[in-house]
């Protein structure tokens, strides 16, 4: 009869073999080349920015000049590009347009993101079956979208690609888990071939599950995009505690605030930075101590004049914290 230790070792070996088999099943597509028409041109060279430089998340479509100009007018030097509006329309002409606008307004694009194609239901009832790379029905289409995003980002010299990977199972024996490992392995390899990191945005999964995914994919190009509010909005973790688990893997950050969910069907409420549950002084201090080199990109999910007013307030709030950290 096997001892308990032998049984645990056998189970661990079986799980590793299962993960390897699932990963190899799709890894062959990971090195797919970019469209020749897009990648034949010279890549735009992004300037360097200071560690923890403030930035703004923008959705450039349909008017990229207005959005990039706004970044400059609000006093930011970096931006995080949400590019869903351009899926299936990434072209050399678009690269040239974006490169010209970034140069014109002296803005550095730090990270590119897509989450589409639809459907995407941002709640607890339908989110698990619609968001990210976990749901089988949408996985391949989203892998294709992420590869498009990666190739376009490469043409602009952007070194990070990010998305929500979805409600990754807490149970590594769930059949969806190794399939998700394989999918994340595939897109991570594609990004690595483009000289980029692939970042899993925090939110739908616990920090421990995200750490397990990092270890199971086992590729240095895989990292974390920390969204401070999402951890709270989805009820998964306090961002301070999440950094204790994921801190060394964080390569991008959304500065966003929110409150814990009190309705089991709906996410918590996003609020202006400084009015929610995120302890920004502690989070930013921890990132500083970890040697974080990325930007601090404000994300405010309102729109119009109210969004601009909110962002101005949030910028001042974060600048005050960052100045204290730098001058300590």
Language model regions located:
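Active-site acidic/histidine proton-transfer and metal-coordination neighborhood
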Residues: 22-35, 41-46, 62-66, 104, ...
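Acidic (Asp/Glu)-rich catalytic clusters
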Residues: 47, 68-75, 90-112, 150-157, ...
């Amino acid at each position: 009869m096997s001892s308990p230790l032998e049984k645990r070792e056998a189970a661990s070996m079986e799980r590793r073999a299962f993960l390897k088999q699932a990963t190899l099943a799709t890894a062959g597509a990971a090195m797919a080349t970019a469209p020749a028409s897009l990648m034949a041109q010279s890549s735009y060279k992004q300037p360097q920015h200071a560690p923890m430089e403030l930035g703004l998340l923008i959705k450039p479509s349909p008017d990229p000049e207005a959005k990039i100009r706004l970044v400059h007018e609000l006093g930011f030097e970096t931006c995080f590009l949400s590019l869903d509006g351009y899926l299936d329309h990434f072209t050399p002409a678009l690269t040239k347009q974006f490169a010209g606008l970034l140069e014109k307004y002296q803005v550095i694009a730090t990270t590119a993101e897509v989450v589409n194609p639809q459907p995407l239901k941002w709640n607890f009832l339908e989110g698990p079956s619609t968001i990210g790379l976990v749901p089988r029905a949408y996985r391949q289409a989203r892998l294709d979208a992420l590869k498009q995003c990666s190739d376009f980002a490469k043409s602009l010299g952007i070194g990070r690609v990010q998305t929500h990977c979805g409600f990754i199972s807490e149970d590594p024996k769930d059949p969806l888990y190794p399939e998700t490992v394989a999918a994340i392995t595939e897109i991570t390899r594609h990004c690595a071939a483009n000289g980029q990191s692939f970042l899993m945005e925090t939110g739908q999964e616990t920090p421990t599950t995200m750490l397990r995914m990092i270890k199971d994919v086992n590729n240095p190009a895989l990292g974390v995009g920390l969204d401070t509010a999402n951890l709270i909005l989805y009820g998964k973790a306090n961002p301070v505690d999440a950094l204790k688990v994921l801190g060394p893997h964080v390569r991008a950050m959304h500065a966003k605030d929110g409150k814990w969910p009190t309705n089991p069907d709906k996410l918590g409420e996003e609020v202006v930075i400084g009015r929610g549950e995120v302890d920004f002084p502690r989070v930013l201090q921890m990132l500083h101590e970890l040697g974080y080199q990325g930007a601090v990109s404000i994300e405010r999910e309102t729109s119009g004049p109210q969004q601009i007013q909110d962002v101005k307030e949030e910028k001042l709030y974060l600048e005050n914290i960052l100045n204290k950290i730098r001058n300590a």
